[in-house]
Amino acid sequence: MSDTPASTFGGRRAVPPNNSNAAEVDLPTEELQGLVPRGVNLKDYLNVTAVHLFKERWDSNKIDHHTDKYDNNKLIVRRGQTFYIQIDFNRPYDPRKDLFRVEYVIGRYPQENKGTYIPVPVVKELQSGKWGAKVIMNEDRSVRLSVQSSPECIVGKFRMYVAVWTPYGILRTRRDPETDTYILFNPWCEEDAVYLDDEKEREEYVLNDIGVIFYGDFKDIKSRSWSYGQFEDGILDTCLYVMDKAEMDLSGRGNPIKVSRVGSAMVNAKDDEGVLVGSWDNVYAYGIPPSAWTGSVDILLEYRSSETPVRYGQCWVFAGVFNTFLRCLGIPARVITNYFSAHDNDANLQMDIFLEEDGNVSSKLTKDSVWNYHCWNEAWMTRPDLPVGFGGWQAVDSTPQENSDGMYRCGPASVQAVKHGHVCFQFDAPFVFAEVNSDLVYITAKQDGTHVVEAVDATHIGKLIVTKQIGGDGMQDITDTYKFQEGQEEERLALETALMYGAKKTLNTEGVVKSRSDVTMNFDVENAVLGKDFKVTITFQNNSSNLYTILAYLSGNITFYTGVSKKEFKKESFEETLDPFSSKKKEVLVRAGEYMSHLLEQGFLHFFVTARINESRDVLAKQKSIILTIPKITIKVRGAAMVGSDMVVTVEFTNPLKETLQNVWIHLDGPGVMRPKRKVFREIRPNTTVQWEEVCRPWVSGHRKLIASMTSDSLRHVYGELDLQIQRRPTM
C-alpha cells in the first residue's frame, strides 16, 4: 500500500485531516502489478478463507488483556501486549514460498508514517515495542499468530485485513466488520505511557465500574455512589465518538496527554458541543437536574444517540462522566474532591471578602467565591514533556470554569508540580495551584475609599482533598499530594516558587494584618435536618482584664455549593458585654419556615458572623456552611442474586415534609445488574410512601451495587444504594 493516498487537496496540505475514527475507506482487494496472463487464476494462489479472533469473553485474548468485562462482541486488546488470531487458508501455508501480512487501518486517509496504516510483518521473533506477528501454530490449512502491537499505538477501533503476495501483486481480504479490533491504553504494559505498577490500583482505577464521589461540607462530608459503567454496551464507541466530535487528529490519540486534554474540553458543552451542559442557577427546564443522575451511562448514550449536549451537569457529574471516558479508554483515573475550593478567576492566590465598616459583608465588593467543594479528576501517565519527576497523577478538570488556550478545559497539570509550586509547566498549573492554596482575606472598605486588611486565613482554602479508597467505599485523604502542611519550610518555598513562576498575589498581607485581638469568637451549628428547626450558637471569649462591648451580626444565606449566595433568609444583630476573662454564648434559633421555601439543589446553608469590638475597633469574622440532612431512598431485592436469574428490585421513598412533592422522578441504575431506568410520580403527599418494582437479570458476578436517586420540584439530592454479591451461575 502506498504511504500517501491520492488526494485532490493541493498546496501545502496534500492530505486532508484524518480526524474521525468512524470515517473509513475500504482498501482494495487486489493491488496488481501489470496485466495477469490469460489462464492464470489468482485464486489458485494462497487465499484467506476465514479469520478467527478469539474474541469471546472467555477467550484468552480478552482475559489476558483485562477486557472481558466490556459488553462488546468485537476483539478488544490493550497495546504493547501480544494477542492471538488464526487465519485459515485454501491450502497449507508454506513459509518458504508464501508471504502474507496482517494490516490494521484506522480512519479515512491511512498513512503508515502517521500510525493510521499498520502493516504487521510475520517475523521469527517478536521485538519489544514493535508491531510483529509470529507463527505459533501451522497445522493443515490454519496458521495461528501471536500478534504484538506497539505500546505507542493509536487508541481506537481498527479495521483488519490480511494481505497475501502473489507473483502478480497483492490479494487482500474484503472489509469485514466482524474482524474490527479495538486497541486501548495498557496500564499493565511497562512501555505504555499509562503504566501503573500496582495491581490493586489497576483494579480500582481502570477496572472498577462503580465509584464513590464525596460532596457536602468539610465538617459534614457526605458521599454518593456513581455508576461509571465504562464496560456497558455502547460506551466504548461513545468515547471514540467524543474524540471524533472534537475532530481530534487520529495520530494524536495514542498520547494520553492529548487525549485527556481533549476529554476535559469535550465533557462540557461550553464551546464545542460537548457532552454536558452545565447549570448552577437551580433552573433545569428541558433537562434533568444534576442531582438526579446516578451514573455516566445514560448521559453518554443520550449524547451519542441525539448528537447534542445533554442537560444538565455540575462538577461531580462532569467528573463522573470524565472518569468513565478515561477508564474506558484504559487511562487510570479517579475523582477528586477539594473542600473549600477557590474559584480564582485571575489565579492571584487570594479570595477577598469585603466588609462594610459596621462589620456586615459587602455583597457589592465581594466578587470571589469559595466553593464548599469542587470535584475534578486525576489521570495517571508519564509526562515526557516535563522534567523528570512530574509524571504520575495529573489533575484534569472538565467543569467549565476558565478558558485555557481558547477552550473551556483544564489540565493535565502535574500534581507533583502543583505541590512544589512549579506552575510554569503546562497545562493550567497556576489555576490548580490557586484552587488549593489561596488565602482568604477579610478587608474593611472604608468610606474614604481605603481598604484595611482585618484578617487573613491561610488554612481555609484546600482544607481537605480526598478520593475513594482502593478496594472500599471509604475516604482517602490525599491533601499532602497537593500541598505541604501549613507552616512547613517546604510550604513557604512552594509558594515562593509559584510566585517566581508567575502566580500573582494582589495584596502583600505580611505585616499588614492587625495584631491579635483580646477577644476570640467561634460558632457552631447543630445538626440540621431538612424541614426542622435548629440552633446556631455563637461563643465569645475575653482573654484580657478589660471590659468589652460587642456589636455582632449573623447572616444566614441559601447558597449554591459554589459559595454563591442566592437569598439571605436570616439576619440578626445583637450586643454583648464581656467581663474580664469571661466567655458568653448567644443562641439563635433558625426556623424551618425561614429557609424551606428558598432551598436550592443541595440544601446548603451558609452562615456569616461578624463582630466589632467597640473599645478596640477590632473586627472578628467567621463563616461556616452546613448541608441539611436529607431523607434517603430505600432499595430492597428479592430472588436469587445470581447471573442469569430474575431478581425483583423494590425502590421505596417516604415524604417526610409537610408539603406535597410535585413532579417526582426516581432514577435506578446498577452496572452489571440492570440498565438505567426512570420512573415518574405526579406527586407524593406528606408522610406518604411510594414504591416502584423492577425485574432485572444480572449478567456480571461479584460485588455489585444498585444506586437510586430522587428529584422533584422542591426536594432534590435524595439518594439510596444497596450492595449486592452476585453469584456465578453453577456449571452443569
Curated annotation (Swiss-Prot):
Q: What is this enzyme's EC? A: 2.3.2.13
Q: Where is this site: Cleavage?
A: R38, G39
- Modification after translation (UniProt): The activation peptide is released by thrombin.
Which InterPro entries does the record cross-reference, listed alphabetically?
Answer: Ig-like_fold, Ig_E-set, Papain-like_cys_pep_sf, Transglutaminase, Transglutaminase-like, Transglutaminase-like_sf, Transglutaminase_animal, Transglutaminase_AS
Q: List, alphabetically, the GO terms of the cellular component aspect.
A: collagen-containing extracellular matrix; cytoplasm; extracellular region
The UniProt entry, under SMART domains, shows:
TGc
Where is the PTM N-acetylserine found along the chain?
S2
Q: Which cofactor does it need?
A: Ca(2+)
Cell compartments where the protein resides:
Cytoplasm; Secreted
Q: What is its main location?
A: cytoplasm
Cofactor: how and how many bound? Binds 1 Ca(2+) ion per subunit.
User: Which Pfam family, just one, is annotated for this protein?
Assistant: Transglut_C
List every stretch annotated Disordered.
1-26
Catalysed reactions listed for this entry: L-glutaminyl-[protein] + L-lysyl-[protein] = [protein]-L-lysyl-N(6)-5-L-glutamyl-[protein] + NH4(+)
- In which domain of life is the source organism classified? Eukaryota
This molecule's function is given as:
Factor XIII is activated by thrombin and calcium ion to a transglutaminase that catalyzes the formation of gamma-glutamyl-epsilon-lysine cross-links between fibrin chains, thus stabilizing the fibrin clot. Also cross-link alpha-2-plasmin inhibitor, or fibronectin, to the alpha chains of fibrin.
To which protein family does this belong? Belongs to the transglutaminase superfamily. Transglutaminase family.
Protein name per the record: Coagulation factor XIII A chain
Q: Which organism is it from?
A: Mus musculus
